[in-house]
Amino acid sequence: MTMATVDPERAFFIDETGTTVEMSRDYARSPEGQRVQEDKPRNYGDVITVIGALNLQGLPAVMTIRGGTTKEVFRAYVEKVLVPELKPGDQVVMDNLAAHKDRRARDMIEAAGAKIIFLPPYSPEWNPIELAWSWLKRWLKTAAARTEEGVNNAIAMAMRVIGSEAPRNWIRHCSYAA
């Protein structure tokens, strides 16, 4: 399958991003002559990985985990989070991460009736979820959560407020007719 065969009405764009408890805004304002004060942890702990699927309605299938994405983690995401959202005829579009090519994960997606489309190598510009992750990281910097629970709560809040207009625009921006 090629990118031209992606139907934005049926597509789930999959990817991962990482965050930590030290995310804060890069810039701030303060009254003239005063410095901005902010507490920022030096030891920011483990990376929190966010695995998600973007479609025209938003980010319906999101999971967070401490650490990176392994085959086992991706398999659990597919089984418990992604597959319940899929319908026969849907398309799962993802990059060439080794975990994405796991046979058991692919079998679960195909058993749900969805088709798998792999992006060309080194082409994040074809994956609109990259724009969603950029938006999420700005959200997390504003939230400035300082605990893993705080980060997870901020992510959950972001998923509730994202709406459907932004995902539609991100998908259109990546040259998929939406």
Explain the meaning of each model-derived region:
Residues A112-G113:
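Short, structured coil segments at secondary-structure junctions
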Residues V47, D95-N96, I117-K141, E149:
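RNase H-like two-metal-ion nuclease catalytic core shared by retroviral integrases
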Residues D7-A11, I129-A178:
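C-terminal anion-handling pockets and recognition modules
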Residues F13-I14, V92-M94, F118-P120, R172:
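Short beta-strand segments
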Residues I14-G18, G52, V78, V92-A98, ...:
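Short, conserved catalytic/metal-binding motifs centered on acidic residues
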